[in-house]
Amino acid sequence: MPIRSTTAALLLAATAAAGLTAAAALPASASTSPAGYYKLLIRVATDAPVMCLQPADPAGGAGTAVVQQPCAAVQAQNWAPLSISGTSYRFLNQASGLCMDVAGGAASGTPADQWPCNSISNERWSWPHSFPDSFWPIRSQVAGSTSYCLDVPGASTQAGLGVQIYRCNNTAAQAWAIAGPVT
C-alpha cells in the first residue's frame, strides 16, 4: 500500500478512536487559524501505537511537561492552533488553557512543557501545511531558529514520556499528524 494511503488509513482509524470527525483540509494562511481543537499525533514505527500529546498532569500549571499518551477522547489531548503569522502557530491546550512551550533555549533535548500563552519565541511552532494534515515535522521557532523539531526521545512508544525539541533529522520520531477538528 502506498505511504500516503497508509497514512490516510492510519489517520482515519486514529481520529475515529479518539472521537474526532473527518474534516476537509483548510489551507493555512497568514490571517486564518483553523477553527477548533485538534489532536497532535505521533507514530514512531509502522507497528507502534498512535500516541497523542497532552500535559503530564492535565490540572497542572505552568511548567508541566508535555507527554505522549495513548489517544483518547479527553480535553487534555485537544490543542487549538492559534495563528501568529504565515505558518507560525501557538498550540493552546483545551484542558489547561496554556500553550505548548520549549522550557529553555534552542538545544537538542530541551523538553516541551506548557506555559501561559504569550508572544515569546518559546511558544512559536511552524506548521507549513493545511489542517488537518499528516506526518510532517513541527518546527520550534525558539530563539529565532527553525533547526529544532518536536521530537519523541529515542522514538520510544512509552506512554507518559515527555517530548522535546531535537535537531531536525527527518525521522519518524519527528513526523507528526494534526487530526481533527475535535467534536
Name these PLM-found stretches.
Residues 1-30:
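Secretory targeting and sorting signals
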Residues 60-80, 107-120, 124-126, 157-171:
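Short, tandemly repeated low-complexity microdomains enriched for cysteine and small residues
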Residues 31-61, 78-106, 124-156, 175-183:
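Extracellular glycan-recognition/adhesion modules and their associated mucin-like linkers
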